[in-house]
């Protein structure tokens, strides 16, 4: 019974340690995963579909010329 209680206490302490490392490496890794796979991250990937469009209009060409002046 004492061994089970000790294992429970140690596992709770380790879990608390993992949870509190939000500002460390695991936190940065989790934030990167959330931004890449989250709703906003996936929605932002849709913006790149415009680059694959083969139809370029005169307005698109004018915008590109203005952008690279």
Swiss-Prot record:
Tissue-level expression: Expressed by the venom gland.
Subcellular location per the Swiss-Prot or TrEMBL entry: Secreted
Domain of life, source organism: Eukaryota
Maturation propeptide residues: 38-69
Signal sequence extent: 1-23
Secreted found in the keyword field: yes
Cellular component terms per the entry's GO annotation: extracellular region
Keywords: Amidation, Antimicrobial, Cleavage on pair of basic residues, Secreted, Signal
Modified residues (Leucine amide): 37
Principal location: secreted
Family according to the record: Belongs to the non-disulfide-bridged peptide (NDBP) superfamily. Short antimicrobial peptide (group 4) family.
Free-text function comment from the UniProt entry: Probable antimicrobial peptide. Shows low inhibitory activity against herpes simplex virus type 1 (HSV-1).
Protein name: Antimicrobial peptide Eval36
């Amino acid at each position: 019974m004492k061994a089970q209680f000790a294992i429970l206490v140690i596992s709770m302490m380790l879990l608390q340690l993992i949870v509190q490392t939000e500002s460390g490496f695991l936190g940065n890794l989790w934030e990167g995963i959330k931004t890449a796979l989250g709703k906003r991250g996936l929605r932002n990937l849709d913006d790149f579909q415009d680059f694959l469009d083969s139809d370029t209009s005169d307005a698109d060409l004018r915008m590109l010329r203005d952008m690279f002046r």
